[in-house]
A protein has these predicted regions:
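Amphipathic alpha-helical coiled-coil segments
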Residues: 41-53, 113, 117-136, 154, ...
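Small/polar (Gly/Ser/Thr/Ala-rich) solvent-exposed segments
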Residues: 40, 59-77, 85-112, 132, ...
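Bacterial Sec-pathway N-terminal export signals of envelope proteins
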Residues: 19-63, 86, 94, 160-164, ...
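Outer-membrane beta-barrel "beta-signal"
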Residues: 79-83, 281-291, 387-389, 398, ...
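Transmembrane beta-barrel architecture of outer-membrane proteins
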Residues: 77, 123, 168, 234, ...
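Sec-dependent N-terminal signal peptides
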Residues: 4-13
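Periplasmic alpha-helical coiled-coil/stalk elements that build and connect Gram-negative outer-membrane
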Residues: 116-231, 238, 328-331, 335
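Acidic, low-complexity, intrinsically disordered peripheral segments
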Residues: 6-7, 29, 384-405
Length: 405
């Protein structure tokens, strides 16, 4: 898999034609959730923990004994026996509860990994969209300077201008081409990362769609408790409680049950003579009491401390995610206002500047240096708008992550 992805990346960087498959964000996320190896690994861990639940009732090995010799008298007798130790039902119940809570924790770990994967896929997806927008902006700028370069070359041939115009245009075109090459390399790196997340050798690229995301969920801090990360932290408290119950159950006595079969040769109490063919049966019942339980009680106390740690981790984790959520909301509002400013005023002004500058240059009302300043000013506005869209999308992706979307 890695070799194929590396080969694909080399093809991209070197400009070799490879088939690209447009994909929507939803389809990309679905593919990643299905194929991503880290998610699969967490799912396997969950299956492993689920299978362990069946091991809650594990009995000690059965003891089978055989004796032969002068057991009861001068005669040689034989004795066969079997014993089995086991705990009270409460022990097995508490062990099963602990294993079930650990399994629930592993299931929540899958949810945490999936939520993070959705966020990573969305971030890469819209970063690739951003790079494509930057590429289109540079290509537009390249077309402007290419047209001017041709005019400057023609003016130089006719003696209507000096060499400065042509050299300046060549310099601008060279810088644009260098930036385009850098963008191509950035796109190749993003392609590699995207394929790794989706665990696919297919060259998936973002499907044409609006470059600006829309926030669908409203801000609601009460839902943060339902976030997979917080649920996972909270689950550690349930594991700690189950661990306390398991340690307490170890103070309960263990039971023993046995059965033996023996021969008693010679004259019995009833004055009858018995040979080896006559067998005598007996049952055995015992109990194991933890007389020296100080160490086990210390284990119980340490398990209680583990619960306190889990409680503090939950409180700290909830406070942390609430703080991050508030920061994300503030970032979203800031970038939303910035984008609105560009869309309502700055972009329109930039377009007017470009068209007016081209017209005035053609009419001879401004010189080349003035035209360059005006064009660069307007394109800085367009570039800043692209950056603002990128920042807005990132803030929305972060909020969607907190909202389990």
């Amino acid at each position: 898999m890695k070799k194929l992805i590396i080969i694909s990346a080399i093809c991209i960087i070197c400009g070799i034609s490879t088939a690209q498959v447009p994909v929507s964000l939803k389809a990309a996320v679905d593919t990643a959730l299905k194929n991503n190896l880290l998610v699969k690994n967490e799912q396997l861990k969950a299956q492993y923990q689920q299978m362990l639940i069946k091991t809650a009732t594990v009995l000690p090995k059965t003891n089978i004994m055989a004796d032969a010799g002068q057991i009861n008298s001068i005669y040689t007798d034989t004795k066969f026996g079997v014993t089995q130790n086991f705990s009270l039902p409460r022990v097995y119940t508490s062990q099963k509860e602990l294993l079930q809570q650990e399994w629930k924790s592993s299931v929540l770990s899958v949810a945490v990994k999936e939520a993070l994967l959705k966020k990573q896929v969305a971030q890469l997806f819209y970063t690739m969209v951003y790079v494509e927008q930057k590429k289109q902006l540079l290509q537009y700028l390249d077309s402007l300077y290419t047209a001017f370069y041709k005019k400057a070359s023609l003016r130089l041939e006719k003696g209507e201008s000096n060499l400065l115009e042509k050299v300046s245009a060549e310099t601008q075109l060279g810088q644009i081409n260098m930036q385009l090459q850098q963008l191509q390399q950035d796109a190749a790196v993003l392609q590699i990362q995207f394929q790794l997340l989706l665990n696919s050798t297919t060259l998936f690229v973002p499907k044409p769609q609006p470059v600006k995301m829309e926030l669908t969920a409203t801000a609601d801090t009460t839902k943060l408790k339902d976030h997979a990360t917080i649920q996972l932290i909270q689950q550690q408290e349930q594991i700690a409680l189950a661990s306390i119950a398991v340690e307490k159950s170890k103070l309960l006595p263990d039971l023993l049950a046995g059965y033996s079969n023996t021969s008693i040769k010679g004259t019995g109490a009833d004055n009858k003579i018995y040979g080896s063919g006559k067998r005598f049966n007996a049952i055995q019942i015992g109990i194991s009491i933890p007389l020296f339980a100080k160490a086990q009680k210390e284990k119980i106390n340490s398990a209680k401390f583990s619960r306190q740690i889990a409680e503090h981790n939950y409180t700290a984790g909830l406070q942390n995610i609430q703080s991050e959520y508030a920061a994300a909301v503030a970032q979203y509002n800031k970038y939303k206002q910035t984008v609105q400013y560009f869309e309502t005023a700055a972009l329109k002004n930039a377009s007017v500047i470009i068209s007016t500058a081209n017209q005035q240059l053609a009419n001879g009302n401004i010189n080349y240096l003035e035209w360059v300043q005006l064009i660069n000013q307007s394109l800085i506005v367009k570039s800043d708008y692209t950056e603002a869209i990128k920042n807005l999308n990132e803030s929305i992706i972060q909020l969607n992550y907190f909202n389990n979307q």
